[in-house]
Amino acid sequence: FDIQHPKEGRVDQGICYQYADLHNHETLNAIQDEFSDKHVVFGMAFPVCTDLSVAGSSRFKSKAEKNPSFQTEAVSYAMWCAKLFNSMHIPYFVENPVSVLATKWRKPDHYFHPYEYGGYIRDDDAEHPRWPEYIAPRDAYKKKTCLWTGNGFVMPTKVAVDPEAYHGNGYSTQMMKLGGKSQRTKDIRSATPRGFAKAVCDANINKGET
């Protein structure tokens, strides 16, 4: 569910993408009602990091002037997701970069960098299928990411690859090539690392099966 998805929905590689305004309480209640009696095995939530990440703290003041409750709403959404997953008795994670969730909600349960799970990506599948010019092969880049977890979530074993070296200015290749505030830039920077996603699936859903 995401507000970016088309209203008519779409299916790609077995994944159903549905439009939803996840900051609308009626929408959230409808989702909860729809899935409360279905066989759901795992939950993942990705609160809007631009409203929470400490990397964007310089813009918090201007955002608050436009909407004084912008951050409260973002934190409430993260907490609502955890509450939903708890009510369904399924393992879950709520993901964000280093952010104010640690102080306005609770401390993260786990931290990771994408390269620490790059070993789950095969050599013949090393290049990112959508953004190979920006995302390093086999997720070989650093980006400290926090996880708030529950209901028996298993943090997968790390199988790391060597991370790409930073440039002289301290930026990764991805950060060097990406700039601005476009939605595309935000999507690339916030893309869930493929290796980590596979590792989580293996540890929590497939239970080691391949």
Describe each model-derived feature in a short phrase.
Residues 1-35, 109-114:
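Adenosine-cofactor binding site in Rossmann-like domains, unifying the SAM/SAH pocket
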Residues 4-5, 47-49:
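Short glycine-rich, polar/acidic loop-and-turn segments at beta strand-coil junctions
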Residues 31-35, 39, 49-209:
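Class I S-adenosyl-L-methionine
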Residues 44:
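A conserved beta-strand element that flanks and buttresses the S-adenosyl-L-methionine
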